[in-house]
Amino acid sequence: MLKRLSIAILAALVLLLALPAYADGAAAAEQSTVLSEKYAGYSHFIVIDKSRNRLFYYQKGELVKSFAVATGKKPSYTPEGLFVIREKIKNRPYYKGKIKGGDPKNPLGDRWLGLKVTLKDGTTSYAYGIHGTNNEKSIGKYVSEGCIRMHNKSVRWLFDQVEVDTPVLIQK
């Protein structure tokens, strides 16, 4: 009898301790489904949440899909702020490593959504992008030099949805 009571009390305690975590997760998920009114007027909009390594794609203010991504090795590597997609390229070469576009060794995969990023010092950079990968196991981790990596299948889908000038909000 005492053993059953102890098990029941233990189960109740575990449930009570788990509820706040579940509620926080549910609230965070719900928060991500609706785009802030400030940005809801855009036909396409991307939010990248570095704290969860997730990309959220919105159309007309409604969440369409979310994806796991990889972001910077250090928090400062992936810039934060409101940017725009400036170019869409299939099979972009990896200039740093002198690897041709379409090569399986290319760490950018076969799709590149290049961002126009205003850096903290006020200069503009076109070196950051949302792209595929040659290392699918890296997705969900903090491993990049600053770009946003996606599974190749996911970035192909996103590439077909977005247009040049689509806003991209990158946040903690």
Predicted regions: what is each one?
Residues M1-I9:
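Bacterial N-terminal signal peptides that target proteins for export
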Residues A8-A18:
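Bacterial N-terminal signal peptides
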Residues L19-A23:
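Sec/Tat signal peptide C-region and signal peptidase I cleavage site
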Residues G25-A28, V34-G41, K73-E80, I89-K172:
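Exported/periplasmic cell-wall-interacting domains
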Residues S32-K74:
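A structural motif detector for short, solvent-exposed N-terminal "entry" segments of globular domains
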Residues F45, S66-A68, L82-V84, A127, ...:
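Well-ordered beta-strand positions in beta-sheet-rich domains
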Residues I48-K50, E87, K141:
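Conserved strand-loop elements at the edges of beta-sheets that form or border functional pockets
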Residues R52-R54, L82, W112:
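Structural motif
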